[in-house]
From Swiss-Prot:
Presence of the UniProt keyword Repeat in the record: yes
Domain of life assignment: Eukaryota
Role, per record: Potential calcium sensor.
Gene that encodes the chain: CML46
Biological classification of the source: Eukaryota, Viridiplantae, Streptophyta, Embryophyta, Tracheophyta
Protein name: Probable calcium-binding protein CML46
Length: 204
């Protein structure tokens, strides 16, 4: 063997041993990466199989809920149409008179101010949210102020609450407490201006 051959043989042998050392060091790293990749792909495959079994159930539930909402919309529209088609009976003069009488208002049946029939639209317009006029507030005050002394005292309040069927009106002490909370002059009664302030704070 010549020197060149010997040198190349030694170089080859040393490079071969270096390769073996580096491959023996990299094998555990590649094995670990391989293990995690295989585990990950198995997990993805299992998850895909698992969820694919339940996907038709999810789609079915979605279809059922969409169908139910469409049926509900359809039924609502049918009921709305039936309601529109019914004759609008509204309120008759006697019904309005009964309500006015229970509130202590004049109920002269011969009064032409009361119509013979009120449609449901007219009744709903009565309850639209709008700011009451001063005259309407005065009329409301007069409902409470039966003795027309210009004040609402606990007895006046109790009378109206009892007529309206509210249980708070059954106890006179409850009525006194309510009056005290709005009584600016601390005399145990509310005057018209206090009533106006109450209405402004609560309804305007």
């Amino acid at each position: 063997m010549t020197e060149n051959q010997l040198y190349s043989f030694i170089t080859m042998k040393s490079s071969l041993s270096k390769c073996k050392q580096s491959s023996s060091l990299s094998f555990p790293l590649f094995g670990l990466i391989n293990f995690f990749l295989i585990g990950f792909f198995r997990w993805v495959s299992f998850a895909q199989l698992f969820f694919s079994r339940f996907w038709p159930l999810v789609q079915h539930q979605q279809c059922v809920s969409e169908k139910k909402s469409k049926d509900l919309e359809f039924q609502t529209s049918i009921k709305h149409e039936e309601y529109r088609d019914d004759d609008d009976d509204g309120l008759c003069r006697e019904d309005v008179g009964m309500v006015m009488k229970s509130l202590g208002l004049s109920t002269d049946q011969e009064n032409e101010g009361l119509q013979k029939q009120y449609s449901s639209k007219e009744v709903s317009n009565l309850f639209e949210e709008k700011e009451p006029s001063l005259e309407e507030v005065k009329q409301a005050f007069d409902v409470f102020d039966e003795n027309r002394d210009g004040f609402i005292d606990p007895i006046d309040l109790q009378r109206v609450l009892t007529i309206l069927g509210l249980k708070q009106g059954s106890n006179l002490e409850n009525c006194r407490r309510m009056i005290r909370s709005f009584d600016g002059s601390k005399d145990g009664r509310i005057d018209f201006y206090g009533f106006v302030k109450f209405m402004e704070n609560n309804f305007c």
